[in-house]
């Protein structure tokens, strides 16, 4: 018989800040490492946009990580970027707890809701130590459902939870009941709605040219802003970076625009957590003009293939050791689902995302020329919504076509 565990995460874009411990930077680096690697692995082309929430995925993965043991735990520690900063399991869970607490203490300049839940098969023997870890480090609710006999009812309950926690932006994660052998579904939901600190004037939004794939000229609603914004040019990325802060200055959207209209692939090849952090450190205020298209994104991914390509394989195999969940080595992750939604307009941003794991029972150097007085986002670009203090990437995407 096969038993499944699904992990889901729902998120909406833009977070706020808190006093940062040195170790919290390490969790942010691990989050960004995972997110940027996923961006490179997800399928994209000149006509396809990409959007995901690294924060959502890493939180959902973190809840599975809490139940991993042995070589499965070792592989996750390495490929999540924890090993590079010498973070062990205890420290990782402590940092997730600190992150949750600090987020709950944020000011109310925007709407930010974060929730986690564990939906378990009725009567299945989840270890108390595991549920305690989910409650302590992730503030997770514990919910029981019957996936074997009342699968449709269970899925309605889960989809209602997802919709409620994302204010209806993500209305469902499952289109049909999961396999009857599902034993646990881990849910992470985050909803964010933020207002630009410097709003775009709606009367100045006009149809303007955008080059899909860097070559195909189309007309799109283009917003215009004249303001003092943080900006830098990075020679390694060969791109301009512009920061659009949200009210409260805790979160911002960073636009990464390659200088070449067809330069997105080259940009992605050199964009790492290290090159990104160095570029962000070199941003400074400048009076400038910005043109940015309005856009909406709605994406859904199966993350198992890209995660496996990143070296995360044991947790998906018959050799997985998730004995920290039930006390036995008969569970493995069947799949990881992720769904994300974003809208960017003159007022600000609203976003949400959902991530899911299924666990089954077996049977360089910088040169900074004078920055451009104008940044016109009229060709493919990368954007991210980040915590301005820790640089934690909450949402990440690339726009190829509008």
Swiss-Prot record:
One of its GO terms (biological process) is immune system process. Its main location: secreted. It is found in: Secreted. The keyword Secreted applies. Saliva (at protein level). Salivary gland. Midgut. Low-level expression in ovary. Residues 1-16 form the signal peptide. Disruption phenotype: RNAi-mediated knockdown results in reduced feeding success rate in nymphs. Longer feeding time. Higher mortality in nymphs. No significant effect on Borrelia afzelii transmission from infected nymphs to mice. Keywords: Blood coagulation cascade inhibiting toxin, Complement system impairing toxin, Glycoprotein, Hemostasis impairing toxin, Immunity, Protease inhibitor, Secreted, Serine protease inhibitor, Signal, Toxin. GO terms for cellular component: extracellular space. InterPro entries: Serpin_CS (IPR023795), Serpin_dom (IPR023796), Serpin_fam (IPR000215), Serpin_sf (IPR036186), Serpin_sf_1 (IPR042178), Serpin_sf_2 (IPR042185). Glycans are attached at residues 164, 230. The keyword Transferase does not apply. Induction: Induced by blood feeding. Serine protease inhibitor that modulates blood feeding of ticks on vertebrate species. Inhibits the intrinsic and common pathways of blood coagulation in the host. Inhibits host thrombin, factor VIIa, factor Xa, factor XIa, factor XIIa, plasmin and activated protein C. Inhibits host trypsin and kallikrein. Reduces host complement activity. Does not affect proliferation of CD4+ T-cells and neutrophil migration. Interacts with host thrombin/F2. Interacts with host coagulation factor VII/F7 (activated). Interacts with host coagulation factor X/F10 (activated). Interacts with host coagulation factor XII/F12 (activated). Interacts with host coagulation factor IX/F9 (activated). Interacts with host plasmin/PLG. Interacts with host protein C/PROC (activated). Has an unusually long reactive center loop. This is Iripin-8. It comes from Ixodes ricinus (Common tick).
């Amino acid at each position: 018989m096969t038993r499944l565990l699904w992990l889901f995460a729902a998120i909406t874009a833009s977070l706020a800040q808190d006093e940062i411990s040195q170790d919290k930077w390490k969790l942010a680096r691990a989050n960004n490492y995972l997110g940027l690697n996923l961006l490179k692995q997800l399928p994209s082309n000149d006509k396809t946009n990409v959007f995901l929430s690294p924060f959502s995925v890493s939180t959902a993965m973190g809840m599975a990580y809490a139940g991993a043991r042995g070589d499965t735990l070792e592989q996750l520690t390495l490929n999540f970027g924890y090993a590079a900063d010498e973070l062990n399991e205890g420290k990782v869970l402590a940092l997730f707890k600190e992150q949750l607490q600090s987020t709950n203490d944020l000011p109310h300049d925007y709407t930010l809701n974060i929730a986690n839940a564990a939906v378990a098969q009725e009567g299945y023997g989840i270890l108390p130590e595991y549920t305690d870890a989910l409650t302590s480090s992730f503030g997770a609710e514990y919910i029981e459902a019957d996936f074997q006999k009342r699968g449709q009812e269970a899925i309605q309950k889960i989809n209602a939870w997802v919709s409620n926690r994302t204010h209806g932006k993500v209305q469902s994660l499952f289109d049909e009941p999961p396999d009857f052998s599902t034993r646990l579904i881990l849910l992470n939901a985050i909803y964010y709605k933020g207002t630009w600190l410097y709003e775009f004037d709606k009367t100045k939004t006009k149809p303007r040219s955008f080059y899909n794939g860097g070559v195909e000229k189309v007309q799109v609603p283009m917003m215009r802003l004249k303001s003092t914004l943080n900006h830098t040019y990075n020679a390694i990325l060969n791109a301009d970076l512009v920061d659009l802060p949200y009210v409260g200055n805790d979160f911002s959207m960073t636009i990464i625009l390659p200088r070449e209209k067809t330069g997105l692939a080259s940009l992605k090849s050199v964009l790492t957590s290290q090159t990104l952090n160095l570029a962000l450190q070199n941003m400074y205020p400048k009076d400038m003009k910005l043109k940015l298209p309005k856009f909406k994104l709605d994406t859904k991914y199966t993350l198992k293939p890209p995660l496996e390509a990143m070296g995360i394989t044991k947790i998906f195999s018959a050799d997985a050791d998730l004995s920290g969940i039930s006390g036995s080595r008969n569970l493995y992750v069947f799949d990881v689902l992720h769904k994300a939604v974003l809208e960017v307009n003159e007022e600000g941003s609203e976003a949400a995302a959902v991530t899911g794991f299924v666990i089954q029972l077996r049977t360089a150097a910088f040169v900074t020329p004078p920055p451009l007085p104008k940044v016109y986002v009229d060709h493919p670009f990368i954007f991210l919504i980040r915590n301005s203090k820790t640089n934690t990437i909450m949402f990440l995407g690339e726009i190829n076509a509008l």
